[in-house]
């Protein structure tokens, strides 16, 4: 981290600041991760662990009066001292995967910091900025959208030079009302770019600014799968999922905007629960995509299931898709029809909204319903047979990773 003096933090009047250190060289919210010189920011129950943080070597502890404002001030202070080029990534789907791909592309040729997991909100973005070192050249941020103004607020802290909108689809409709609302909210990233910045956006995305370079993404970029890898833009990637090609194209556009060279071959380490593949008994396969779901990503996952399964029986364990507003029942029924269309032979629907999958999935040979993830575990364990190809996917709140973990344990 670019060091900050404790006295400077004190002058920001962010809350109750304690400690004997003169300089902080890191920021943590988990006392177990404290290293000497860190600032421990107590959030929620973290207030109980201040003494533990000091004992582990923290330079100071902060109990913020207004947590979001405190994190914003810390992130802004570090960002203002950094000469790194910042890339902000948002979109209805693919944000984290695009971030992971871009990080793998940049790392060989530039000192790069990128968001851990899905550190994409008012706490996660500043925490990522607080990892910038004096010699950091590129910072890759993921920007969440849970309503109007959030992306603009995050951009005010991060000041991205390059903005990537991966795609726009029906997500967070409870918060923004319509697809037009999603466009408006995502457009805050483009509006926040500096003159001379680069906006990388879907083909039909409206951009009114004339003082930024606009790169438009094709919905189906040219890609070729061979020998278990995918070739996009002259770069060989270690994945075969069809939807990742679009994420790779977006990442390559950002790489070009940064002026960095394209490597010939890249092995991406994707964040957990985003299409992780685990062998199952009898030549079966588990596709753990349980981190999140919406209609766009759910269809993409079903396409991947169909392409990957081959002659194996296709099993889908699908949970609720959250924040779809009044159209939620219709969206779930539409996905149910996609389940049937892509040849799924056994479907387990998890959650109240997931009943809609069953309504749309006429023709699927075997269907089951469970109230929650815990109740789904025994149903899935009974249903899955050796040699099956199993997709597990739902919105984050469903917690469907417990099903994936139960299946993976069988193969351990």
Regions found by a protein language model. Give the residues of each.
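Residue-level signal for inorganic ion chemistry
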Residues: 9, 38, 53, 74, ...
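Short amphipathic alpha-helix with an adjacent loop that forms part of the alpha/beta core around
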Residues: 377-383
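N-terminal leader/targeting and accessory segments in enzymes
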Residues: 1-77, 308-309, 324, 338, ...
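Active-site beta-alpha connecting loops in nucleotide-dependent enzymes
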Residues: 45-46, 271-273, 282, 290-363, ...
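Mobile, glycine- and charge-enriched loop segments
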Residues: 33-40, 130-139, 305-325
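Short acidic-hydrophobic, aromatic-tinged amphipathic segments that line or gate anion-handling sites
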Residues: 62-65, 367-376
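Phosphate-binding loop of NTP-binding sites
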Residues: 67-198, 207-211, 405-412
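Acidic, Mg2+-coordinating active-site environments of NTP-dependent enzymes
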Residues: 12, 16, 162-285, 311-312, ...
């Amino acid at each position: 981290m670019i060091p900050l003096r404790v006295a400077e933090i004190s002058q920001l009047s962010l809350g109750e600041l304690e400690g004997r250190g003169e300089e902080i060289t890191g920021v943590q919210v988990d006392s177990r991760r404290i290293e000497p010189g860190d600032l421990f920011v107590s959030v929620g129950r973290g207030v109980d662990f201040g003494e533990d943080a000091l004992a582990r070597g923290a330079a100071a502890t902060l109990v913020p009066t207004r947590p979001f404002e405190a994190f914003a001030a810390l992130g802004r202070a570090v960002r203002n001292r950094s000469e790194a080029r910042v890339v902000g990534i948002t979109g209805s789907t693919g944000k984290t995967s695009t971030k992971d791909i871009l990080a793998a592309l940049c790392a060989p040729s530039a000192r790069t910091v990128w968001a851990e997991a899905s550190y994409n909100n008012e706490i996660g973005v500043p925490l990522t900025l607080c990892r910038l070192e004096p010699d950091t050249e590129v910072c890759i941020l993921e920007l969440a959208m849970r309503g109007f103004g959030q992306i603009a607020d995050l951009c005010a802290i991060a000041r991205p030079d390059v903005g990537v909108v991966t795609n726009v689809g029906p997500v967070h409709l409870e918060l923004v009302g319509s697809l037009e609302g999603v466009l408006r909210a995502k457009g805050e990233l483009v509006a926040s770019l500096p003159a001379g910045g680069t906006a990388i956006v879907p083909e039909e995305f409206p951009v009114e600014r004339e003082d930024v370079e606009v790169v438009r993404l094709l919905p189906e970029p040219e890609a070729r799968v061979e020998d278990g890898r995918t070739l996009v833009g002259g770069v060989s990637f270690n994945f075969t999922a069809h939807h990742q090609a679009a994420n790779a194209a977006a990442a390559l556009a950002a790489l070009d905007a940064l002026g960095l060279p394209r490597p010939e071959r890249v092995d991406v380490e994707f964040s957990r629960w985003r299409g992780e593949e685990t062998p199952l008994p009898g030549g079966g396969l588990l596709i753990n995509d349980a981190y999140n779901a919406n209609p766009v990503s759910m269809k993409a996952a079903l396409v991947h299931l169909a392409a990957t399964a081959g002659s194996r029986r296709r099993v889908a364990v699908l949970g609720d898709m959250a924040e779809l507003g009044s159209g939620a029942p219709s969206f779930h029924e539409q996905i149910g029809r996609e389940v049937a269309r892509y040849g799924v032979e056994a479907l387990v629907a998890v959650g109240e909204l997931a009943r809609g999958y069953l309504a749309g999935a006429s023709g699927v040979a075997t269907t089951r319903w469970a109230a929650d993830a815990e109740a789904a575990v025994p149903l899935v364990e009974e249903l899955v047979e050796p040699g099956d190809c199993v997709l597990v996917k739902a919105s984050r709140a469903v917690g469907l990773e417990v099903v994936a973990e139960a299946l993976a344990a069988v193969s351990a």
